[in-house]
Amino acid sequence: IIKILIKNNIYENKKVCFSLKDNLKRKLISSVGKLDSIVKITTCEYDSLKSNLRELILTDYIRKENVNLIGTNESLTSINIVTIFESIRRKVNVNIGVISGSLVILPLFLSSTITLKHSLKKIENTDYAIFSFSGDNKIKVELVSKLFSEGRINVLIGTKSLLGEG
């Protein structure tokens, strides 16, 4: 058995070691199958908590160029802020928010309640819009965090770099 472990680079210094190679690690991190799991978890939590749901999903990738997939039936082939948002939006009836340094997506109905100066671009075939705010990221994070804590957003998807520290 040890020879097999050594041959497969799993046995080092008399210990079994399951360190992942960079290419395998990237494949696991970007696995599209995770989208289905995220949707299942969100569905289960929403079924249990209803409007009391407060789910935070942190990820590393934004992929703003994937915004054109929102509101379509196109397949989602990578895992990032936009595809996580769209996977949940397609299958679970919850209010979702997205926040990163370069992208904020919120339900349209929140526009009238946001007092902070903003502009928005409606996303076709959805009840969501891309919001733009003047000022720094701290202002956006405070606003979206407040909406989340008040329950106006049930699921918040953000980048680790922006939300993970706060």
Task: Label each residue range with its predicted role.
Residues 1-155:
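Conserved C-terminal RecA-like helicase domain
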Residues 161-163:
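Alpha-helix capping/helix-boundary segments
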Residues 147, 165-166:
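A general structural signal for stabilizing positions within well-ordered secondary structure
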Residues 158:
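Short beta-strand and adjacent tight-turn residues that come in two discontinuous sequence segments
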